[in-house]
Amino acid sequence: MNILVTGAKGMVGTALVNNLKNIRDGKNRTRNIEINEIYEYDLDSTEAELDEYCAKADFVFNLAGVNRPENPDDFMKGNFGFASQLLDTLKKHNNKAGIMLSSSVQATLAGRFGNSEYGRSKKAGEELFFEYGKETGAPVYVYRFVNLMGHSRPKYNSAISTFCWAVANDEEFTVNDRSTELEVLYIDDLVEGMFDLLEGKEQHCEFDGVETVLDENGRYCCVPVTHKATLGEIVDLLEEFKSQPISLMMPKCPDGSFAKKLFSLYLTYLPTDKFKYAMKMNCDDRGSFTELVHTVDCGQVSINISKPGITKGQHWHNSKWEQFIVVHGHGLIQERNINTGETVEFEVSGDNIEAIYM
């Protein structure tokens, strides 16, 4: 399969292209997708390149568009005008490849989006694609995305990116209303949704105002995994992430949670001098003890270094339990029943790593 990605250097395009390359190069074998060529088209590409790519593509992701033009009239030129050029070029080559359009929930023109010039331009692009599908028989997949959360330029089009950058870089920022709620789609979930599309497993939907309603016969497509959070909740999480190297407290980030995705995004904004941070080594004549990570509900991880011939321990706890793992050197671990005096012992070595319950 040859895949054309327009807007390939944008936030979504960059993430999608990088992940498509992982599949093409055999680094991601979790998907049933065979990729030969990935054609990357962006503002610095030529019409000749677009012509070549449209002749050869087996599937097209149209991510190109504008969202912050200096002149509002450029919304229609950037979002509708290029879409027309792309579809005309595909028609020229009689290429009926499937094509995906990246649209926006603003195209509903519902609620606060009723007067959105951006929404009108996206709506016009949608109708153009649907008409193209009727005219040519080519499969058309229109996605109306909510706020996207991924690594992008701060102070531009994403409050979350701006907050991540500001907190990570100790910059001042303003939250106008902590109660404002955002519905966001994380970039990794979007990419997985595009892989589902390539495998013929896309989700269809309709819209009730700005709300997505799953419908297997729906006109639109969607990535159903979104998250809702207030600006206050987002900023509080970011401040917690920032304090982690000091408190050592690992934030609660269950698999698939908004917190886990936000933490992953936050780390992409760290300046390089914050990639490394010091740990406090508590040293004495016996060796050292260093706490690495604390968790809210799963205890902590630490490193205990003992000098040769040193005995540590000689105490007990009521409910606390530990696992000792020797990763270097040799040692003898002895556990004693305080009621009977019975002792069991385990010889341990970094040459054969084992865990011992205490």
Language model features with spans:
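N-terminal Rossmann NAD(P)H-binding glycine-rich loop of SDR-like oxidoreductase domains
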Residues: 2-26
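NAD(P)H-binding glycine-rich loop region in Rossmannoid oxidoreductase-like domains
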Residues: 43-85, 89-92, 106-113
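Conserved Rossmann-fold NAD(P)-dependent oxidoreductase catalytic core, especially the SDR/UDP-sugar
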Residues: 84-126, 133-136, 141
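NAD(P)-dependent short-chain dehydrogenase/reductase
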Residues: 130-142, 146-182, 187-200
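Mid/C-terminal beta-alpha module of Rossmann-like enzyme folds, strongest
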Residues: 196, 200-281
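A short glycine-rich, His/Asp/Glu-containing loop-to-beta-strand
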Residues: 273-314, 320
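Glycine- and acidic-residue-biased ligand/ion/polar-headgroup-sensing regions
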Residues: 318-338
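Short acidic-glycine-tyrosine-enriched beta hairpin
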Residues: 337-358
